[in-house]
């Protein structure tokens, strides 16, 4: 079967690309998705405690003013379920599902020079051809399972945050070992600790974690973000990573010690990723990085 464009993945990028290719350009488009529904990383990563580390009012689509203003986020940092609900809302709003096939994983994509076409095959023995092939698989959906000797014969239950089962799992009064303290590890550990008999965390490299200061969003805040739609949309295009905050242009060494502490304390209390934007050289000079990093020692 021939399509003008085939998109691999139905996460944030894949859904947006489908809308652009099909609705804006008019291409005959197909999305191939391995999962059972839309969501991408937010479909696969459904482990306890899973939530976004970017603020909800900027971790969303801004191409549609109607969608931006009609969807009401509940928290500063949304949970996995809320983000998945948001993507389902967008999919329904734009009628995207009719051009998505689920439960199909792309096994091969080969470019046919003589025909100027891509030949795409899935694990369900389906073959498609297209002129444009767009990869929207992202970087957060591939699992990394350690090659642990004896794992296959382990009689207890073992799980991976990136492929969490759909059913509810109880860890109450159990001995649990956790390997890794990346973003997922940091989020799941405190949730597990509430019910387990014991939790042992195996950590190779400690990561620096800043308080999120998560909270429920007030009606006033929600109204302000809706009213500032155009401003926020333009701001995201001009800030690093599209995070919605500017990095300081001043070095940490341009400030006195007391002034540095005041700036850092304010950012620490505010929480979130903007903490790294206090000074221009936090991630560029080791000496500056140490000063900023040591702030956490005050709060231990």
Mark where each language-model region is.
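Catalytic micro-motifs at enzyme active sites that drive phosphoryl/nucleotidyl and oxygen chemistry
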Residues: 163-168, 188-189
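Short gly/ser/thr-rich secondary-structure transition/capping motifs
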Residues: 117, 157-163
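N-terminal FAD-binding dinucleotide-binding subdomain shared by FAD-dependent oxidases/monooxygenases
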Residues: 1-5, 10-151, 167-168, 181, ...
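Intrinsically disordered, low-complexity serine/threonine-rich segments
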Residues: 161-162, 172, 224, 300
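Glycine-rich NAD(P)-binding loop of Rossmann-like domains
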Residues: 168-176
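Rossmann-like NAD(P)H-binding beta-loop-alpha module
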Residues: 176-196
């Amino acid at each position: 079967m021939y399509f003008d464009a085939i998109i691999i993945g139905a996460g944030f990028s894949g859904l947006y690309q489908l809308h652009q290719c099909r609705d804006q350009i008019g291409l005959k488009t197909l999305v191939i998705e391995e999962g059972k529904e839309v969501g991408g990383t937010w479909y696969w990563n459904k482990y306890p405690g899973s939530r976004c580390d970017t603020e909800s009012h900027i971790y969303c689509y801004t191409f549609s003013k109607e969608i931006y203003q009609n969807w009401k986020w509940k928290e500063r940092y949304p949970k996995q379920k809320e983000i998945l609900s948001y993507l389902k809302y967008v999919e329904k709003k734009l009628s995207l599902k009719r051009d998505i096939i689920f439960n199909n994983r792309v096994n091969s994509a080969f470019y046919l020079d003589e025909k100027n076409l891509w030949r795409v095959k899935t694990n369900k023995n389906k073959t498609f051809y297209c002129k444009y092939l767009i990869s929207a698989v992202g970087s957060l959906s591939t699992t990394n399972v350690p090659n642990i000797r004896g794992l296959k014969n382990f009689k207890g239950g073992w799980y991976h945050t990136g492929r969490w089962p759909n059913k509810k799992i109880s860890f109450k009064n159990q001995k649990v070992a956790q390997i890794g303290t990346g973003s997922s590890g940091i989020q799941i550990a405190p949730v597990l600790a509430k019910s387990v008999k014991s939790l042992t965390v195996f950590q190779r490299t400690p990561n620096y974690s800043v308080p999120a200061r998560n909270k429920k969003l007030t009606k006033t805040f929600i109204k302000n973000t809706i009213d500032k739609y155009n401003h926020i949309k333009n701001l995201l295009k001009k800030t690093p990573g599209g995070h919605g905050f500017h990095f300081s242009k001043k070095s940490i060494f341009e400030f006195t010690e007391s002034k540095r502490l005041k700036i850092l304390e304010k950012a620490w209390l505010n929480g979130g990723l903007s903490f790294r934007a206090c000074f221009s050289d936090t991630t560029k000079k080791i000496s500056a990085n140490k000063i900023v990093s040591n702030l956490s020692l005050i709060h231990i």
